[in-house]
Amino acid sequence: MTEKGLKGVANPSAIFLSTHGDPVAGSCVLVTLEGTRPLLVEIQALVDSGGPSPRRLSVGIERDRLAMMLAVLHRHAGIAAFDQDVFVNAVGGVRISEPAADLAVMLAIQSSLRGKPLPRGFIAFGEVGLAGEVRPAPRGQERLREAAKLGFSIAVVPKANAPKKAVEGLTIHAVERIEEAIALVRSL
């Protein structure tokens, strides 16, 4: 809002992305949909030693969904956080209700647990099922184009969302299972 009225926001995704100089552990950028518009949102996770009763807190992500993702990580990727406090935050207070956030949340959690940041320019999206499968997200091509437009260079996406032709400036890694995605990011 200016003295002359409303002014458009050139890059709404900038509101939901942190301005870290270097990548930090526990951070993963997600391409979500707000209505029909792709929007980049940073997901932050902090995994810390818990007491006798570990806590699971989330802001912007449903708490029950977080508990389910932690169980899938343990069962299918061998990442145990059952005795740890786990905190997850969607930057900027945005509420993410679509399941396409699952993959980014899980990669942020494993990054925090290992204390190793994901590469600079990294994005991820995809639903993760209880059997560990990575399911496609709606409008995947639009999500990838938006990420490339904003300068992101590495994407981990469901195999069904992999484009038939390359997206300029974006290296796309298509995965079918959560353990495959975890192994991939560990090798980057």
Which functions belong to the PLM regions below?
Residues 1-188:
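Peripheral, non-AAA+ core regions of ATP-driven protein-machinery
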